[in-house]
Amino acid sequence: MNIQDLGSIGELIAALATLLTLGYLAIQLKQNTSALRSQTFQQSSMDMSLTANSVSSDGELAKIIIKAENGIASLKSDEKLRFHFWMLVAVRRFEAIYIQALYGSIEKERIEGFETSILSLLSNVGNEWWKLTKSAFSSDFTVYADGKINSGKYKVSVHPGASVE
């Protein structure tokens, strides 16, 4: 065996080591992607829960939302302000989830429940607010939300399972 043969064996070993390293990195990348998606879902779930909790823990806010079913004009000025900013937070949180789904950080199937919650709100009690405020959101989100709202799929007034009658 001459030096050229030893050099060829060395190149083969280096190529195999490179392939093993690439395989290892691919496995690590897949695990990291899975962990990122899980973490994104967990954070999204917590954010949406905070939105719901603000209503369940604040009787006055709950009354404002129920009153808003009769239109924004039925609200007093301080109620309009509270309703506006609560809606802004709720919809902004969902917009962030929608964007994460576009980026692939969360699977679209995982956001269906969040989607139903917010779009039910925007289709009914929050519809007037949405028409007045949607310019504050990204244009692609606005097109998406309007398409979903106009589908007529979201019939409940505030949230699936919540009766405010």
Q: Language-model segments: which ranges?
A:
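Membrane-embedded hydrophobic alpha-helical segments
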Residues: 1-39
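Amphipathic alpha-helical "stem/stalk" segments
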Residues: 5-8, 31-165
